Amino acid sequence: MKKIPHLFSGLLVALVASSAFADATLLNASYDVARDVYKDYNPMFQKYWKQKSGESLELKQSHGGSTKQVRAVADGLEADVVTMNQANDIEFLADKGLVAKDWAKKFPNNASPYTSAMVFIVRKGNPKAIKDWSDLAAPGMQVIVPHPKNTGNGRNTYLSAWAWALKQPGGSDKSAQEFVGKLLKNAPLFAAGGRDATTTFMQRKMGDALVTFESEAEMIAKEFGKGDFEVIYPSLTMQTEFPVALVDKVVDKKGTRKQAQAYLEYLWSKEGQENAAQNYLRPRDADLLKKYAAQFPVVKTFTVDEMFGGATKAFLVHFKDGGTFDQIYVQK
């Protein structure tokens, strides 16, 4: 029994020593299901930066629902960079003066180094025969999703369902609102974040389907095994983007602008793009996307700009206080 505190104190010493010998420390505030991609990315960047500059970096992560994360940054969490799954979350920080107004022009691809798609995770054998969005709104179905007010994952689910309904014969905003209302009624709860939704579905065994990022399916396979679930690609789904930005006020205060800039730029390097692909995120690099084509089925997608006039407009219409989500959820 005496060995336990000894080992623990040794771990603390190691952590303190790691921090003490670092030339700089960066904090990346990110969305909930980005844990794995940055767990792999950070050591790669540390090695690259050491070779390039001679500096040792300590890299820290903070994960949670994307909207909660940016609110934490606005409230004083000193993140050097934000890596999110909704452009309007970064716009929120820009409006607060923490991020540059033209943040989306600071990096390629509107500052989104990779993409994904919203998919359904169902039980092995697909016992409820779920094939498309219409099935998720059927009576008696249980659907696990994160909270659309607080998470990019939840918003992307909501907007994907809305867009699908609009594209149906005779589709209108009225019919889309009615359809999404039916789907939301089938959610027994709203998870706090994407990883919480996965835990609810896989460990707590709640729900008939989990709606999440395509990349999350690989994490589920690694943690729970491929034998317990199947991935269903709906007939239409959102191409999700993952915008990144420097938190200017923080990097200028800490003197870490150079390191933070390089940290984000490296996401577009061959190594950074390969890491994204290995974590089942669709890389921007065309050659790598072709190399990993077998794990990325062709799927009909739309962008939030095409269907909703951009993430900020979608937020104002659907997710601000009193928006369509609140109207639907009150009815729920």
Where are these regions (language model features)?
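N-terminal signal peptide c-region/cleavage motif recognized by signal peptidases
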Residues: 17-21
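Extracellular/periplasmic juxtamembrane helices and adjacent flexible linkers that interface
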Residues: 251-332
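Ligand-binding pocket segment of bilobal, Venus flytrap-like solute-binding proteins
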Residues: 168-235
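A bilobed periplasmic-binding-protein/Venus flytrap-type ligand-binding module shared by bacterial periplasmic
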Residues: 117-126, 241-258, 275-279
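Bacterial N-terminal signal peptides that target proteins for export
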Residues: 1-9
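Short beta-strand->loop
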Residues: 29-31, 122-124, 142-169, 183-187, ...
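Short helix-loop capping/hinge motifs at secondary-structure junctions, enriched
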Residues: 125-131, 150, 163-171, 250-258
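N-terminal segment of the mature folded domain
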Residues: 23-151, 291-293, 329-332
